[in-house]
Amino acid sequence: MKSGIHPEYVTTQVNCGCGNSFTTRSTRTSGQITVEICSNCHPFYTGKQKILDTGGRVARFEARYGRRKK
């Protein structure tokens, strides 16, 4: 491997909008990253995600192609 071509890999503090913070490693030289959503407040990870049948698309698909057999 060539020397001197790889970026410096430093410890970085990640701060979320919900107040959660954690430490990781990154090539970002400032040592700080601010994010809006993390795994503590994202609906997918918190279990608050809702799957909506928008406009009957699932029902229309099932009517065309039939229900999937389990």
From Swiss-Prot:
GO terms for cellular component: ribonucleoprotein complex; ribosome. Binds 1 zinc ion per subunit. One of its GO terms (molecular function) is structural constituent of ribosome. InterPro entries: Ribosomal_bL28/bL31-like_sf, Ribosomal_bL31, Ribosomal_bL31_A, Ribosomal_bL31_sf. It comes from the Bacteria. Keywords: Metal-binding, Ribonucleoprotein, Ribosomal protein, RNA-binding, rRNA-binding, Zinc. The keyword Membrane does not apply. Its cofactor is Zn(2+). One of its GO terms (biological process) is translation. Zn(2+) binds at C16, C18, C38, C41. It holds the Pfam family Ribosomal_L31. Signal peptide: none annotated. Binds the 23S rRNA. Belongs to the bacterial ribosomal protein bL31 family. Type A subfamily. This is Large ribosomal subunit protein bL31.
